[in-house]
Design a protein with these regions (language model features):
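Short, electropositive alpha-helical surface patch
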Residues: 63, 68-72, 234-241, 329-346, ...
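Flexible glycine/acidic-rich beta-alpha junction loops that bind and position SAM and/or redox cofactors
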Residues: 12-21, 109, 228-229, 288-293, ...
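Acidic, low-complexity intrinsically disordered segments
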Residues: 1-212
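Structural recognition of alpha->loop->beta junctions
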Residues: 110-129, 269-277, 335-350
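Radical SAM [4Fe-4S] cluster-binding motif and immediate context
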Residues: 154-318, 323-338, 366
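Conserved beta-strand positions
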Residues: 7, 73, 120, 219-221, ...
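Short amphipathic alpha-helical segments and helix-helix/interface helices
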Residues: 43, 84-88, 108, 131, ...
Length: 510
């Protein structure tokens, strides 16, 4: 009758924009930018009387000699390879291995036969059955979860997760998104009907994280503001809670869609509540590509102007951009470079369009005979499983390489940082020391060693922070992501050391 479990979040296959490998490379330490949410969420569903241990492999080695009788492994497609390695290793050691999470939910056949038990979909409604079967020695090969009522969700077991080396915690306030972007895999297993936790639940989770010393939290929603009435009620509760904190305010990040820019009152409330930065899927200035992908919420607006509204409200936008749509021709790289240069957005997540397994895009590309089924999306930012329509694969990769070198050039990045600062209002609630944190300062020193351009850019950045101490957290975060991006480009052999362009030299001389 097994009653001990080891829950693992595996290491990613390779560096990514918002991961933290650069911290190890700069000899700062091994810890994630954001703490894992899946492992403490699953831990909260384990019955009383069980022994529970959590491992986030981004911060510690997996204990292959654990005494736990059951091993549970979660993960996304980017963790696919490591999920399989760990499942095989623990089965060889006689452990009962469960596998679940987004990747298994979307592509269960990929882990079938490798793990003993597959948990497909959301675990909450089937957790009691799973653990009862395990205790009885009668675990099934597969369990399928439904769409649970999040108002019944237990508080994650953050007490089992060490926050000492994590920069931010997570609270999931909802699941699902009503939009239907054809490349989005989230809605394929979480659904298009958004489900929410009550504000009191969210505050309870924030209280727990605050007591553990956390002062930065990702509100891990697929679209935080899409249901305005619900978002307002929650933000009002968070604002009231945050004003009562006596050992520093909590700051927040989340994901929202560009249509939030049409609601300045909501954005103002978000900033007062403590929202600091937000991820937005901008994708492309190519309207035909937006139509093709059913990204309707980005149509019929001036995207750069809408991003400007979000900055003017006091938020740092983290903009997701994509090339490789069927309507993208060879000119898309210059179009994207010009568009991105116009944004007051230091943080750009630039990627090639990939068709995730289980999405409408995957089905369409497969039906058209343009799907590379050998590629699964876990390796390289210039890789894709889609054979493009209007250019060769070689042209797409070469164009992407030029594009990332342009937008992440240190001077071009600095221009976007300064555009962000110029467009940002003064926020007295964010006033602090006019200097970077210790981690940011050590990353800056590591970046400066790359060359004269980086050194000069950092001098301008430090001067900017002295002028605008209210922006230190946002600019500091931008610096962390920029350093991680440069590390990632080095890892993939994509960074080109080039002489400055005339435009860059003009900035240098300004």
């Amino acid at each position: 009758m097994p009653k001990s479990i080891y829950i693992i979040n595996p290491q990613e296959a390779a560096p990514y924009f918002f991961s933290s490998e650069v911290l190890s490379a700069a000899n700062i330490g091994r810890f994630p930018i954001v703490a894992d949410l899946a492992t403490p969420t699953v831990a909260a569903l384990v019955p009383e009387g069980w022994s529970i241990a959590i491992c986030d492999e981004r911060r510690e080695e997996v204990d292959l000699d654990t005494e736990a009788e059951v091993v549970a492994i979660t993960g996304k497609v980017s963790q696919r390879g490591r999920m399989k390695e760990l499942a095989r290793a623990f089965r060889q050691r006689g452990k009962l291995v469960l596998a679940g999470g987004p990747h298994v939910s979307l592509w269960p056949d990929d882990l079938r036969g490798i793990a003993d038990v597959l948990v497909i979909g959301e675990i909450e409604e089937v957790a009691a059955e799973i653990f009862a079967d395990i205790e009885a020695g009668a675990a099934k090969a597969e369990y399928r979860g439904g769409k649970p009522d999040l108002r019944l969700s237990p508080r994650p077991r953050w007490d089992l997760y060490r926050f000492r080396h994590s920069m931010a915690g997570q609270v999931q306030t909802s699941r699902g998104c009503p939009f239907e972007c054809d490349f989005c895999d989230v809605i394929q297993y979480l659904g298009r009907k958004q489900r929410w936790k009550e504000p009191a639940q969210v505050i309870d989770e924030l209280d727990q994280l605050y007591r553990l010393g956390c002062r930065d939290v990702l509100l891990a929603d697929d679209n935080f503001t899409v249901m305005r009435k619900r978002a307002r009620a929650l933000l009002e509760a968070i604002e009231a809670w945050n004003t009562l904190q006596t050992h520093g305010r909590m700051r927040f990040a989340t994901q929202l869609s560009i249509d939030a820019a049409r609601d300045p009152e909501l954005l103002g409330l978000a900033v007062r509540a403590g929202l600091d930065r937000c991820f937005i899927g901008i994708e492309t200035p190519n309207e035909e590509a937006l139509k093709e992908s059913l990204k309707r919420q980005n149509l019929r607006v001036d995207l750069a102007q809408e991003v400007g509204k979000i900055v003017a409200a006091g938020l740092l936008p983290l903009c997701g951009m994509i090339v490789g749509f069927d309507h993208d021709g060879p000119d898309i790289f210059d179009r994207q470079a010009r568009f991105i240069a116009s944004l007051p957005a230091p943080v750009i997540q630039m990627g090639m369009l990939v068709a995730p397994y289980g999405t409408p895009l995957w089905s369409r590309i497969k039906e058209e005979g343009r799907l590379d089924e050998e590629f699964c999306g876990e390796h390289n930012i210039i890789g894709s499983n889609i054979r493009p329509k209007l250019m060769s694969e070689a042209a797409l990769k070469a164009g992407m390489r030029r594009l990332v070198n342009d937008i992440y050039d240190p001077w071009n990045w600095l221009v976007r940082v300064e555009q962000f600062a110029d467009a940002s209002p003064l926020n007295i609630n964010r006033r602090g020391l006019a200097a970077f944190s210790l981690i940011e300062a050590r990353l800056a020193a590591s970046l400066a060693r790359r060359g004269a351009a980086e050194t000069a850019v950092l001098a301008r950045l430090e001067a900017l922070v002295r002028r605008r101490p209210d922006l230190v957290s946002q600019i500091g975060y931008s610096l962390i992501v920029y350093c991680q991006t440069r590390h990632m480009l080095d890892h993939f052999g994509l960074w080109d050391d080039r002489r400055p362009s005339p435009r860059q030299r003009a900035v240098m001389q300004a």
